[in-house]
């Protein structure tokens, strides 16, 4: 049976339980608390206090999400879109992607090697297939073109 979220203490405890599992953005945490029946007038003060105490951090959430999704084989465009759908500021997303220490070229090559076993496309159809897959994963057409044509990704 779920707890009734009708007091500031109950809302804070539930928010902290969610944050203990993994980082959350403010919008995502608000949505989850609403789904659990917490009223808006209790959610905002609780989240403000958690942010003041450093327990709720958009920067940490962005960093964690970028690391998690890039390790899963996704590129910057896909990650940017997913974070935008989660209600985060585009400027903050772009800054976090720039500051992340992800080597996108190496990540692209890993994903390509894993999916296509390092086999460069021999015909237009297989090139289109590989391009579609890598673009869907969120890598830029420029990087994909360099990889598939055998050019250096770091130029």
Curated annotation (Swiss-Prot):
InterPro entries documented for this protein: RecX_HTH_1st, RecX_HTH_2nd, RecX_HTH_3rd, Regulatory_RecX, WH-like_DNA-bd_sf
Top-level taxon: Bacteria
Keyword Cytoplasm annotated: yes
Compartment(s) of residence: Cytoplasm
One Gene Ontology term from the biological process aspect of the record: regulation of DNA repair
Pfam families given in the database record: RecX_HTH1, RecX_HTH2, RecX_HTH3
Keyword terms, alphabetized: Cytoplasm
CC per GO annotation: cytoplasm
UniProt keyword annotation of Cytoplasm present: yes
Role, per record: Modulates RecA activity.
Family the UniProt entry places it in: Belongs to the RecX family.
Protein name: Regulatory protein RecX
Organism per entry: Pseudomonas entomophila (strain L48)
Gene that specifies this protein: recX
């Amino acid at each position: 049976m779920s707890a009734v979220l009708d007091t500031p203490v109950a809302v804070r405890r539930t928010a902290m339980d969610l944050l203990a599992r993994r980082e959350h953005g403010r919008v995502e945490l608000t949505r989850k608390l609403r789904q659990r029946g917490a009223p808006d007038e209790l959610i905002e003060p609780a989240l403000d206090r958690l942010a003041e105490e450093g327990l709720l951090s958009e920067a940490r959430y962005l960093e964690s999400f970028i690391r998690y999704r890039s390790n899963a084989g996704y590129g910057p465009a896909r990650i940017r879109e997913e974070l935008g759908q989660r209600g985060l500021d585009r400027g903050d997303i772009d800054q976090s992607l720039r500051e992340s220490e992800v080597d996108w070229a190496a990540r692209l090559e890993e994903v390509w090697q894993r999916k296509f076993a390092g086999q460069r496309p021999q015909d237009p159809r297989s090139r289109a297939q590989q391009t579609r897959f890598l673009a869907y994963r969120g890598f830029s057409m420029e990087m994909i073109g360099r990889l598939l044509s055998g050019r250096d990704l770091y130029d």
